[in-house]
């Protein structure tokens, strides 16, 4: 009787331990999903911001070109604004990549990755 009782107690403890581990993993996954959603939202805002930066840099570049034609801006000014526009475009591309990574991570965590052939 005592051997069986001990085995039952041991199995009960193992079952409880497994339940706790499952609960911990579930909470950990839920936390990762929340973090991934927040990361995706942050990167989405960054894409929006960098889009606005490109528009601004484009406007400044066009104004500088016009000023150069009128003789009020130098070639150096044009090159500087051209460089600023290119930097804004590069920053935008990096932001898009970061967004896609965050979106993929969220899909991975939630099991929403579809493989279309």
Name each model-derived stretch.
Residues 42-94, 107-109:
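Charged, solvent-exposed structural "stalk/scaffold" segments
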Residues 29, 91-117:
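Acidic, low-complexity, intrinsically disordered peripheral segments
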Residues 36-37, 75, 96, 103:
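Canonical tetratricopeptide repeat
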Residues 4, 74, 114:
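Short, flexible micro-motifs
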Residues 1-59, 94:
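Sec/SRP-type N-terminal targeting helices
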């Amino acid at each position: 009787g005592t051997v069986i009782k001990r085995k039952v107690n041991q199995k009960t403890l193992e079952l409880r331990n497994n339940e706790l581990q499952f609960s911990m993993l579930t909470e950990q996954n839920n936390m990762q999903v929340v973090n991934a959603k927040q990361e995706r939202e942050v990167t989405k805002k960054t894409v929006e911001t960098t889009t606005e930066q490109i528009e601004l840099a484009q406007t400044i570049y066009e104004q500088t070109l016009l000023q150069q034609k009128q003789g009020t801006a130098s070639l150096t000014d044009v090159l500087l604004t051209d460089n600023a526009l290119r930097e804004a475009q590069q920053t935008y591309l990096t932001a898009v990549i970061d967004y896609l990574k965050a979106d993929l991570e969220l899909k991975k965590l939630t099991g929403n990755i579809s493989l279309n052939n």
